[in-house]
Amino acid sequence: MKHNPMTAKSQIFPNHRSSRPPADLLEGIQVVDDRFLELIDRHTVIEKHWTGCEWAEGPVYFPEGDYVLWSDVPNNRILKFDAQSKETTVFREPCNNTTGHYRDQQGRLVTCEHSANRISRTEPDGTIINLSLIHI
């Protein structure tokens, strides 16, 4: 079954009106697929908060702490951006070249670890639990 991006857009942003943002809004941003432009409100302010990732992937937002985690895969680290302080720090290094993250229903970080060939969960106390039963 082929995914229809327009259907997904209407379900995710039901009140969004598509309008191409002004060119200066996208300065320094590489747009690979023009459909991305349909998701940006023309009055949005885009701010760059970090440079220095070789390959960034897997952002996940934690609203209770108002921060975002993401992977810098080749540099083997997870970075953390604090929305209040506007500071980016290293959350975990090394991190087994994590490639993706999400939050489970209890708000814990679940991570795909490339070099360890596993899926892990980080407990509130920082303990890392292996969720994979079979290593490939």
Language-model-detected regions and their locations in the chain:
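A generic, well-ordered mixed alpha/beta core segment in the N-terminal half of proteins
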Residues: 117-132
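Blade/loop signatures of beta-propeller domains
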Residues: 10-44
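Blade-loop segments of beta-propeller domains
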Residues: 79-114, 118
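Short coil turn/linker residues within repeat-based beta-strand modules
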Residues: 75, 85-87, 126
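Conserved small/polar residues in nucleotide/adenosyl-binding loops
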Residues: 134-136
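A short beta-strand motif characteristic of beta-propeller blades
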Residues: 46-50, 87-92, 129-132
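Conserved beta-strand positions in repeat-built beta-propeller and related beta-rich domains
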Residues: 22-23, 51-52, 61-63, 68-74, ...
